[in-house]
């Protein structure tokens, strides 16, 4: 059987609930106006660690020589970090006007201990819906955060987390992970979270002049959405992970003009892919990459200002208490609507995670499949300059992304990620 294609079984060994060492009772944390834009739903993130060695454990405060001792260390550190990140140990409730709030009641975080009959090198990273979902990530989620720690046959470990996206985004969750790892290594925490919602308060402004018209296009109150036609068949998006070499990123920037950021150049490249997958927008197909990058910059610039985000806070305030959804994720029941949409995340890299037995060999986010929207999440690597890209897109876009010549290299297994012999593909 080819490496990266192995099917495997997972056995749950135990389920424990880890509570903070200092309890918080009855405190309610309201959602900010930005938080109210996020619909209920869980996101996942997982970290793969090689089997510990004396070299990788040299900075550990105790001997992480066995899986049980590592799990015990994770639990002990988790109970401490939840004192600082106490909302993650709570649960969502509804307030008197129907909006979600976090009840900080110290219910704790479920931690699952499991065993998987597979080696780390055999994991099919390219297709995480098969190799990761419901295997290395918690399948049943209680509260805001659930964690699964899985021992692999080779002695490697995967720490999988599933969390309610309304409570935390990728950046703040990485703050939590970094703090958890610091405590595990008896190191001081670098960043302390702030729960001061007044920093994100809307301006004193009347609803009639509180919003830029662009927000009415980007977001939609759920009550405005048409009812879904049950006879309409919408294809599910697929999850894939790709590798892009630093050489290809540099080549994109060269073709797009060095005045543009790498993220703008990457977005311009993706625009042309979307145009190709839709078999239309000929003007975009005929444009040079540098010209498309200029257009991306023109559209992006207004959305990177302080006024833009202040205006968004005002827009949400004017529409409270109506549930709101990003238009890109609003399923459409019009069979004739064949538009293609895609969004790109911030493209920032995050700190390496080390609980005391070495840095994670690989990590990625994971999201349940949906039927409309789609996005690309580029994750620049701090040491090599290479990118890992998590993609949740339609099958037609996958075909366009992988059509040669392309910068997207399917990440079939960990060997592709760890190899230093990658070559430029563009």
Sequence positions of predicted segments:
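N-terminal low-complexity acidic/Ser/Pro-rich tracts
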Residues: 10, 14, 20-22
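Short, surface-exposed beta-strand/loop micro-motifs that present aromatic residues
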Residues: 36, 144-150, 372-380
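Low-complexity, glycine/alanine/valine/leucine- and proline-rich hydrophobic stretches
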Residues: 330-417, 424
């Amino acid at each position: 059987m080819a490496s990266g294609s192995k099917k495997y079984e997972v056995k749950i060994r135990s389920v424990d609930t880890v509570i903070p060492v200092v309890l918080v009772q009855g405190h309610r944390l309201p959602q900010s106006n930005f938080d109210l834009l996020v619909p209920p739903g869980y996101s996942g993130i997982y970290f793969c660690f090689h089997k510990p060695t004396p070299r990788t454990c040299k900075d550990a405060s105790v001997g992480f020589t066995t899986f049980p001792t590592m799990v015990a260390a994770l639990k002990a550190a988790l109970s401490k970090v939840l004192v600082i990140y106490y909302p993650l140990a709570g649960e969502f409730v509804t307030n008197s006007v129907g909006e979600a709030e976090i009840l900080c009641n110290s219910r704790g975080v479920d931690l699952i201990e499991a065993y998987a009959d597979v080696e780390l090198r055999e994991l099919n990273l390219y297709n995480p819906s098969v190799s990761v979902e419901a295997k290395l990530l918690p399948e049943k989620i209680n509260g805001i955060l659930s964690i699964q720690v899985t021992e692999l046959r080779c002695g490697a470990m995967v720490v999988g987390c599933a969390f309610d996206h309304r409570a935390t985004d990728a950046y703040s969750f990485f703050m939590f992970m970094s703090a958890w790892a610091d405590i595990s290594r008896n190191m001081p925490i670098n960043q302390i979270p702030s729960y001061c919602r007044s920093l994100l308060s809307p301006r004193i402004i009347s609803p009639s002049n509180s919003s830029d018209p662009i927000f009415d296009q980007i977001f939609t109150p759920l009550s405005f959405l048409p009812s879904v036609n049950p006879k309409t068949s919408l294809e599910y998006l697929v999850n894939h992970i790709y590798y892009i070499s630093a050489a290809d990123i540099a080549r994109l920037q060269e073709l797009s003009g060095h005045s543009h950021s790498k993220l703008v150049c990457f977005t311009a490249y993706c625009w042309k892919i979307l145009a190709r997958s839709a078999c239309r927008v000929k003007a975009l197909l005929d444009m040079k990459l540098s010209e498309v990058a200029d257009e991306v910059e023109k559209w992006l610039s207004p959305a990177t200002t302080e006024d833009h985000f202040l205006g968004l806070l005002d827009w949400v305030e004017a529409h409270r208490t109506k549930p709101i959804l990003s238009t890109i994720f609003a399923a459409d029941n019009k069979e004739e609507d064949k538009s293609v949409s895609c969004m790109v995340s911030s493209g920032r890299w995050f700190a390496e995670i080390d609980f005391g037995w070495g840095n994670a060999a690989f990590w990625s986010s994971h999201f349940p499949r949906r039927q409309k929207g789609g996005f690309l999440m580029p994750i620049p690597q701090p040491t090599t300059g290479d990118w890992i890209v998590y993609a949740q897109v339609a099958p037609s876009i996958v075909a366009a992304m992988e059509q040669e010549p392309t910068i997207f290299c399917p990440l079939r297994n960990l060997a592709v990620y760890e190899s230093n012999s990658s070559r430029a593909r563009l």
